[in-house]
């Protein structure tokens, strides 16, 4: 029988939490109720879902999807996020599941793929968090006390879709990667 349990696939022996079951049920309901998303959602599933507090009373739902299903999710990202936010009343962010591999030991002939380095994983998570906006610039500012603040400039074309979520983006990224990030839109220079 086809149920909402098929929409969440976790590691062997790990049971989904109650919150993850509700997210999987929302996916299942969207697939059965929404005709325009039905064919796109048919083969898609999620790995995990976490709920986190954002500035103020708002909450965010971070949904981890398998890395190889990243492209199909991005194809329907805007519609899917709109529907899930309407149902839940929370900000929804999709992030691909990535794995960091420790650097190889001295003298080891094993090569570590670039996609498995800490830097590449954190950059990938950053791109996933701000999607559908694109990152057009990045500045790192070091404060006098040694703290590091990263300024991310987003594409102004997607301002209408993403401006209300900027605090959510920075809170989610801080929770996932432990780095302080400020999101801005570059000021257009008029000649």
Swiss-Prot record:
> Which Pfam families does the record match to this protein?
Ribosomal_S7e (PF01251)
Single GO cellular component term:
90S preribosome
* The organism's place on the tree of life at top rank: Eukaryota
GO biological process: any one?
rRNA processing
Determine if Ribonucleoprotein is one of this entry's keywords. Answer: yes
Query: Which GO molecular function entries does the Swiss-Prot or TrEMBL record give?
Result: structural constituent of ribosome
Q: Keywords, A to Z?
A: Ribonucleoprotein, Ribosomal protein
User: InterPro entries from the xrefs?
Assistant: Ribosomal_eS7
Family of this protein: Belongs to the eukaryotic ribosomal protein eS7 family.
Q: Which PANTHER family match?
A: 40S RIBOSOMAL PROTEIN S7
Name of the protein in question? Small ribosomal subunit protein eS7
